[in-house]
Every structure is written in structure tokens, then in C-alpha cells.
Amino acid sequence: MSLNTKLALPIALGLSLVTVTAFVAYYVLKRDEEENDNKTVKITKINTIEIHVPKSIVPALIGRNGSNIKDLQKKSGAQIHFKKFTDQDYDVCVVRGRADTTQLAETLIHDFIKQQPTIMSESITVPSWSCGRIIGSGGENVNDISHRSGARVKVESPKSTDKVAEHLVTFRGTKEQIEVAKKLVENCVSLERCRREIEQSKRPPRHSSSPPSPCPSPGDRDADADAQGDVDHTRVKYKRPETTGPSIEVYVSAVSSPSRFWVQFVGPQVAQLDDLVAHMTEYYSKKENREAHTLRHVSVGQVVAAVFRHDGRWYRARVHDIRPNEFDSSQQVADVFYLDYGDSEYVATHELCELRADLLRLRFQAMECFLAGVRPASGEEAVSPSGQTWDKWHPQAVERFEELTQVARWKALVSRTCTYKKTATAEGEKDKEIPGIKLFDVTDEGELDVGAVLVAEGWAVAGPAPSPRPSPPRGHTTPFGDLSKSKVLSMTGGGGRSSSVPKDHKDDGSNVLTVEGDDSKDKDGITASKSLASGLEKSDRHPLSISNFDLSYPDPSRNKQLNGSDDFLHGERQNIDNEITIDTLVPPSPLSNAPILSKTLQDEFKANMNRIDSHHSNLENLGKSAFEK
């Protein structure tokens, strides 16, 4: 028994240890199994959603530097990016993430799209002359309009090089934004129109006259026809034909006939010319300044300062001819052409003054043109002694043309260059090209074709492209063609008017000064021309007679040179004198007691050198403007 008892105790302990060990092993294994079960990775399905977003809303959805997209990703927990398509009007927004996050992101994106206002586009047309005001310096004004309205504003450039009368302005934004932008643009147009009207009102007409009265048509000249002519005038409207020539705004400054008139370009140079004329008038109105710039010798082709007797102002002019005064053989008159306006007039040589060199900085503004596509209804032509021909217009046709163009009243017209012709304005002068243009009066009611109105009223007939025809010669018989009968030009008692003076502004003879003879002079009644408002006193020095006036330049050694254009020209003449030597042509029987009338080829060359041709300068500017625009 004792032996069994001794064995039982170890056996019991052994069984206990085995049991405990087994239990511990089971517990440890069970725990490891549970831990392994807890470490199992849960796999979730990734969703991808594609949303079509209009291209106009994509920038707003992305936000500046992606701020809106980052905010949506943070709120939803999904990843968002875009696929762009150039051939579609929408982009694709790709949303990736768990089902719940992608659904939330999709909801946020759709809500954002619904909250966006409708983006639309509109366009309006504005006059081309207002584009500068709308755009501003360096685009300052158009950027300000976009900033204040919130809409995108763009002034469209013409597709062709043609300079059109209207430009297209496009707006892009909401309806409210576009309305604000349109009001701002219309305000710019109104301001520019007001500025142009004020600027035009500051340019007084170069004559004092009443408004133009309607002119009867050739077929019927009674009062009823007058009224009917007015109705026709307001009813005849034409659209400009599609041509390749540039359209430019011009003023008609002087008219000889529809076949010969002068225009000025509308632009900043107009104000510069007005300032120049005001300065010249103020300067040359002072007696001491006129005495300082007295011309001791006047030559053909010389650019001078001359007073225009119809308004008393001083202008730049060129001497085209020197002739004796028909009323005083001891006086000479110069046939001058006003380079900035196109008028021509006879002025006493002692009333001309030297033109300061600084007054030549502004180019001459008058450009000679002819009305393209029309001919006189009568088909008559005038012929000069040299055989040159030009169209002869009825005086009332010229008056009607002046009324339609509002000559010298600074009404802006649209011109389109159609053709050119070669012509010479003086006998022996080199031919130059004169542009043939069509004129249109653009109003709110429509466009009025001046040439078509003349044809409709019977003053002209439509014709093909004009063939080259020389302008009226500037000889001693008919120096101004259609204006040869003008009282201003021919110094006679009858005739018409100056090229920029209307029919209701005629001379009454008060401008002719009668010089009563004294004991030392002949008792015959002698008249001498005197400019209105010129402020020039009677000259005390003995004037040159027709027998001794000379077309050559004065001798620098005998005449003191003054500061101005003569200093520059004198240096050029000296250079020519060193290079050219031609014998003087002497008339066969000169007067014994008078200097010889000499006119050499050298003199002709010098005179041509002294001329500053405004027409070619304007033609070059016309060509450049067409390409620049």
C-alpha cells in the first residue's frame, strides 16, 4: 500500500502538469488564432464616376489655383481630376473613391453647376471712330470695363485690311454682366461723339454764310420741283459697294467741281492744324512781325504766309504765279494756293510774308481728289490753248455738290478710293496721281452716296472708271479751269466765288480800295486789291512793274536773310549754284530802261526744289494707313 501511495503522488502531479501544459498550449494557440483573425485586411470596392461639365463652367469649378477642387476633395474624401476634349463643348470630371465618397463628391459638383449663372455671348456694332475711346491707351479702358462689369469684352478687328466704318464688340458673361458692359461701351461712344461735335464746333466755317439751300434739278426749276428735290434727297439711300479700297473719314475743304476738289483727313492732325492757324494769325497780325518777315522778292513755287481775305486769318500758301494787277499796273499780285485747305486766291505781293521754318513741321493737309464714277450730264469739256481738256460742270451742279458735301463746314464724310488718274496742275509740271474717290454721308437713317444723288437728280451721269484726264492748266488765260470766271481769282467785277465760299457769300465791291490821285500822281482812278482784316497798311516803297519783275531768286548778297525757311533754302541754292551753270535766256528785244526778264532752266530747277508737294505726301499717308489698319 505504501508503494502504491508513493506512486500515486507522482502520477497525480504528472497528470496535473500535463493538463496544465495542455491547457496553456491550447490557450496560447487559440489566442494566436484570434489575433490572426483580427489582422485580416478588409478589401473595399473603388468606384469611378464621370461627370460632363460645360467648358464655360470648368474654370469656375476648378477655381483659382485649384482652390475649389481642393475644397471639394476635402469635403468628400474622393479624388477629382479632369479630362479635356478639344472637339467637344464639355470636359469630363473624373471622381474616384469609395462608394459613399464618390456619391458625395458627385452631389457637390452637380449642386455647384446648378448654382452657376447661364453664360451667354452678345455682340454690338460701334462706329470705327469710337474704338480708340473704348480700348484706351494700352487697353486700359476695355480692361476697366471688363473689371467693372465682370463680362469679357473684346473689340474685334476687321478680317481684311479694309478700314470699315463699324467694328464689332463682343461680350461674354451673364445677362446682367453683359448689360452693364454694354452700357459702359455705349457711354464711351457717347463721350467720343460729344468730343467730336465739340471739336467740330470749334472749327468755324472759313466763311460767313447761311445754311445751304436746296438746288433745283435741271429738268424743272420751279418751287414744286424744289420741294420734290428735297424729298428725293432724303429718300435716295445707298449702301457702299464692296470694294478693296480703304474707307477713310474726310472733310471736304474746297471745291472747284466734282472733278476737282480738296479734302482733309479726320484725325488728331485737324486740331494741330487749327492750333497752327491760330498761332499764325496771332503772330502775323502784329505789324512788327510782318515787317520782320517782309519778302523783298517773291518767286513762283515759294511757300509763304498769306492772309485769306474771307476770314482774315493767316495760312500756309504756295505761289503758283505772279501777274500784274489789272487795276494798277504798278502793282503785282500773286496767285497763291492755300496748302492746307485747297483754296486759291490772288493776293498782293507786298502782303505776303516769309513763312517761319518751324511752321512747316505739320504736313500740308489738303489733298486733291475727283469724284469717281460720274461725269457731267451735259458731257461738255473745256479745252485750254495747249489742247488739254477737262470736264465742264454746270454751275448749279457744282453748287449741289457743295451742298451735299457741306464744303468748309467740317462735316465728316466717309471716302473710298476707287481709282487714280495722272494729271499736271501746271503747264510743264511733272504729272502726279490724283485719287478718284466716292463720298458717303453716313447718318442714323442710312448712307447717302453723293455721286449717286447727283446722278439721280440729273446733274451727272454714271460712267466707267475715269480715264486719265489732265486738270485745268494754270496758264495766263484760265489758271483755275472751272474757277476762271471767279471774281476773286480773275480780279474782275463779275463771276462766281472762291472754291470754299458758297453762293450766298458774294463780294460787294467793298474790298476794292480806290486810290485818289494827288498833284504828284496821275488823276486817273486807280484801284488796288486789299485783303479784308489783314491789317496791312499801304506800302510806301515803289512796287515792281510787270516789265521788271523777275522769277529768279534774289541775290543773297543784296538781300539780308531772315531766320526761317530762307536760311535752309539759301544753303540748298548755294549747293546747286556750285554744281549747275546754264546760260541766261535773254528776250530778243528787252526794254532799254528796265531790267531783263530772265527765267533760266536753273531758275525752274530752283523753283521746283522750293515746292513742297502736299498731295504726294497725303497719298503716301493714305497707302500706309490702309496697311496699318
Curated annotation (Swiss-Prot):
Residue ranges, compositional bias (Basic and acidic residues): 219-240
Keywords for the protein's UniProt record, in alphabetical order: Differentiation, Membrane, Mitochondrion, Mitochondrion outer membrane, Repeat, RNA-binding, RNA-mediated gene silencing, Spermatogenesis, Transmembrane, Transmembrane helix
InterPro entries documented for this protein: KH_dom, KH_dom_type_1, KH_dom_type_1_sf, SNase_OB-fold_sf, TDRD2-like_tudor, Tudor, Tudor_domain_containing
Gene Ontology biological process terms in this record: P granule organization; piRNA processing; spermatogenesis
Quaternary structure note: Interacts with (symmetrically methylated) Siwi. Interacts with (symmetrically methylated) Ago3. Interacts with PNLDC1/trimmer; interaction takes place on the mitochondrial surface and recruits PNLDC1/trimmer to Siwi-bound pre-piRNAs.
Function: Participates in the primary piRNA biogenesis pathway and is required during spermatogenesis to repress transposable elements and prevent their mobilization, which is essential for the germline integrity. The piRNA metabolic process mediates the repression of transposable elements during meiosis by forming complexes composed of piRNAs and Piwi proteins (Siwi or Ago3) and govern the methylation and subsequent repression of transposons.
Protein name per its UniProtKB record: Tudor and KH domain-containing protein homolog
Species this chain originates from: Bombyx mori
Organismal lineage: Eukaryota, Metazoa, Ecdysozoa, Arthropoda, Hexapoda
